[in-house]
Amino acid sequence: MLMHSVRCWQYASAFAVIDGLRPDREALYVACLLHDIALGAEQNPVAGCFAVIGAGRAEEFVRRHEGDDRTAQIVHETVARHMDVETPMGSEAALLHDAAHLDVSGRRIRDLDPHCVDVIESSYTREGFAADFASRMKIESRRRPQSTAATLWRSGMYPAMKANPLERRVISSK
């Protein structure tokens, strides 16, 4: 999952250039690294989605490491919104959302220069990612069946993951 998070950072940075956005780079980096920290986490009676649970943990991380309120709030919002069906408002939230959706299902791959994709994919291995992520999503959908993640899973996330052009690149390189 760490390589997924790092790829998200790389893809988010590329999308920032393409989309003409100027995110808070530190907040975006932290959000990218921590966005799946609660995927499959224990039950939480208050939060109905791992993204919201993870947002709280990521915000706490920023505060514990002397981050300012603004950064903590951006990280929280960015992590909380990364599973939204539509791209959320706000530079950081939009960039992580689109990067995570690209890495998982290939969404927006045509927006990127193929060389950029080659560099990222050759630098940060995705071997085993689809199986690991699918396993975690199954757990997540059982723990929080009303969550956005569970709804996306039931709506065909796994076939979209298997059809991801990035995932097919791994298979063809073996």
Question: What is each model feature region?
Answer:
Residues 56-63, 77-80, 100:
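A broadly conserved amphipathic alpha-helix scaffold signal in soluble, globular proteins
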